[in-house]
Amino acid sequence: MTNADPHELQKFSDLAHRWWDPNAEFKPLHDLNPVRLGWIDAHAHLAGKRALDIGCGGGILSESMAGLGAQVKGIDLSTEALGVADLHSLESGISVDYEAIAAEAIAAREPGTYDVVTCMEMLEHVPSPGDVVAACATLVKPGGWVFFSTLNRNLKSYLFAVIGAEYIAQMLPKGTHDYARFIRPSELAGFVRATDLHIVEIKGITYHPIGKRFALSNDTDINYLVACRRGA
């Protein structure tokens, strides 16, 4: 059984044609991308590395990593989003290999294959996030890096990420997030501890409304990033 929620898949498939419009529904991802890309590259030094982007959607992060010299494969279960990703790759001239396959399925097929595995803004959209974390641990080479980003579960994150971002500021479409699926850092750390990954760094992401920009911070109350490494 695929670890996916049909409602979540349909939600993002319906918006697939908007992935690369920097002023549409995925504007927050476009604004966030330079921050997360720089953080990933600072740890993993992407040039020349083989990278897998799980839950790649329309390919915003996948293309960015390829642009830094990584050999990138992007996977997603939304064929509509992957169609947009393929088309944009042709238009940009940045080569990325896209495939419609679940993380668990590719982990069974390609264990220990990738230097870098990214799973960004995806765990909070699947029924069993721990299974995805385990798949990431299987996919990465010994000594390789795995990166996660997700949303903390607390009153502050509900007020800012759901009420504020979706209903007041309308930065995201209503219904983008299901608060019950937000993941506390301690819960994600538990998933990681069940694998042979170890956590290297946890960073928060803060949004500055005046400058309309995201920045790394030590505040993990809302959005946060986790860098993990597999034992050599």
Curated annotation (Swiss-Prot):
This protein is called Ubiquinone biosynthesis O-methyltransferase
Residues given in the record as S-adenosyl-L-methionine binding sites: 36, 55, 76, 120
Superkingdom per UniProt: Bacteria
The record ties this protein, via NCBIfam families, to: UbiG
Give the gene symbol. ubiG
UniProt pathway? Cofactor biosynthesis; ubiquinone biosynthesis
Please describe what this protein does. O-methyltransferase that catalyzes the 2 O-methylation steps in the ubiquinone biosynthetic pathway.
Task: List the GO biological process terms.
Answer: methylation
Q: Which residues cross the membrane?
A: none
| Catalyzed reactions per annotation | a 3-demethylubiquinol + S-adenosyl-L-methionine = a ubiquinol + S-adenosyl-L-homocysteine + H(+); a 3-(all-trans-polyprenyl)benzene-1,2-diol + S-adenosyl-L-methionine = a 2-methoxy-6-(all-trans-polyprenyl)phenol + S-adenosyl-L-homocysteine + H(+)
Which family is it part of?
Belongs to the methyltransferase superfamily. UbiG/COQ3 family.
* Enzyme Commission numbers on file: 2.1.1.222, 2.1.1.64
- The EC class name is transferase
The record's section on InterPro entries has: SAM-dependent_MTases_sf (IPR029063), UbiG_MeTrfase (IPR010233)
Q: Which GO terms describe its molecular function?
A: 2-polyprenyl-6-hydroxyphenol methylase activity; 3-demethylubiquinol 3-O-methyltransferase activity; polyprenyldihydroxybenzoate methyltransferase activity
Q: Which keywords does UniProt give here?
A: Methyltransferase, S-adenosyl-L-methionine, Transferase, Ubiquinone biosynthesis
Q: Which first-to-last residue range defines the signal peptide? A: none
